């Protein structure tokens, strides 16, 4: 079904621009706060929570060629969790970290880190993450390393750890950042044109910051802030030319000034500029977004009524 979406009258920061979303096959298991990664023609989704607030450790695959979801027939050795982190290097996915409980206890912050080989279909446990700041770490992958940025455990961080793929070791890096790049939790990020970008999130309020991670000089460099009010629990992906940011929520100073987002905006690394490009058919946090085969797919998440979504769309400009 082809949907033409205009700005939502209740969303203050959506311009009168149209975005075309093609509704695709719904996810069989409504999910929020899952970890997403792509390989060949499939979008993979690990973990997250369902409509009954149950955490899962299932691994699902969505085929972009057949428009079908399937549960991957593998014994996943990871515990059920939300807010895990994942990325792909070569023929392997790297998955782990996250939170497995509903109460704030140290054992709920998970430090395990795993490799899933798409060719052999085997799992391998790797070196544990060396800190317990394991909620929603944003991962950036290069050929020989993975950078785990930010994360959370009862305090806001600006930490960056480097995982050496060959040596199977983690190293905490000394990072240089100006005051305009805050400590935070619940950030998002993506790699575009070989450059790594991270931002938004929460620190005593929803944030608008946007920064570039320069691994060679170990610097977080301020970039143009996102449009509108701050947001956290958003999702982010990158095409060859742009970084797309969608959904999330804004925490207000009172119970009546907070709101959820359905807006989609994109960032041009070349021009260091943001622009609105449209909106989702619903407002939600902790959705999933992925770029694969020159297409963006987006959906799932939790709306402001606390309902976990199963909707799935292909985004077209």
Where are these regions (language model features)?
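C-terminal motif of bacterial Sec signal peptides marking the signal peptidase cleavage site
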Residues: 6-9
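Kelch-like beta-propeller repeat domains
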Residues: 11-317
């Amino acid at each position: 079904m082809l949907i033409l979406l205009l700005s939502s009258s209740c969303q203050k920061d959506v311009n009168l621009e149209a975005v075309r979303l093609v509704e695709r096959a719904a996810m069989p298991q409504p999910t929020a706060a899952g970890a997403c990664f792509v390989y060949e023609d499939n979008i993979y989704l690990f973990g997250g929570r369902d409509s009954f607030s149950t955490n899962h450790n299932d691994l699902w695959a969505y085929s972009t060629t057949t428009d079908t979801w399937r549960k991957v027939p593998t014994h996943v050795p990871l515990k059920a969790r939300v807010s895990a982190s994942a990325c792909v290097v070569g023929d392997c996915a790297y998955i782990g970290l996250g939170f497995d409980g509903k109460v704030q206890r140290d054992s709920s912050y998970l430090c395990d880190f795993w490799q899933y080989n798409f060719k052999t279909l085997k799992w391998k446990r790797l070196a544990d993450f060396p800190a317990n700041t394991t909620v929603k770490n944003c991962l950036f992958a290069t050929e020989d390393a993975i950078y785990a940025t930010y994360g959370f455990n009862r305090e806001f961080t600006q930490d960056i750890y480097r995982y050496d793929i060959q040596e199977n070791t983690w190293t905490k890096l000394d990072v240089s950042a100006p005051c305009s790049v805050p400590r935070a939790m619940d950030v998002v990020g993506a790699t575009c044109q070989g450059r790594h970008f991270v931002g938004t999130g929460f620190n005593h309020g929803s944030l608008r910051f946007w920064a570039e991670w320069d691994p060679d000089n170990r610097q977080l460099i301020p970039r143009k802030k996102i449009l509108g009010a701050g947001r956290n629990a958003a999702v982010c992906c990158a095409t060859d030319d742009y970084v797309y940011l969608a959904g999330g929520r804004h925490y207000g100073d009172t119970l009546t000034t907070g709101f959820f987002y359905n807006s989609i905006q994109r960032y041009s690394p070349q021009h260091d500029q943001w622009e609105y490009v449209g909106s989702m058919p619903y407002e939600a946090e902790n959705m999933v977004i992925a770029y694969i085969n020159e297409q963006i797919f987006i959906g799932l998440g939790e709306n402001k009524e606390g309902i976990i979504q199963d909707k799935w769309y292909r985004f077209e400009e």
